[in-house]
């Protein structure tokens, strides 16, 4: 829904993750999550269809097994809550976690060629995840591809293994 990122006038001021999800992040997952949040803070295009110019705060969580996008205004009042079934994301999240585990092993073993191959696979999976995020939010949220990629990373962090 975001063919022209320049046309998307809204943006996220901040992203808040539900930290009450069980299980600790691996160092690689933590680094990915922190990088995604920093990148979103620096540059993003995100607008509700009903509030196309709003600067918003996104509270991202998993509640009752569902992915919740609680989009709020700058006064922290909910503008819209979007609830998505996690099913379409499950296999990508599982693949992403396996890639991160493989990456950590390759780094520990110093296998540069393997690290590069895994990194290419990870970029491809991020792209697929971004497309899925955009498809699932189509008609509700306008966002650019880079914002969708970063949100996919955060979705994976919320669904970490216990």
Swiss-Prot record:
Coiled coil: none
Ranges that cross the membrane: none
Endpoints of the signal sequence: none
UniProt-listed NCBIfam families: PRK02853.1 (NF002769)
Annotated family: Belongs to the UPF0262 family.
Name of the protein in question: UPF0262 protein Acry_0160
Lineage, uppermost ranks: Bacteria, Pseudomonadati, Pseudomonadota, Alphaproteobacteria, Acetobacterales
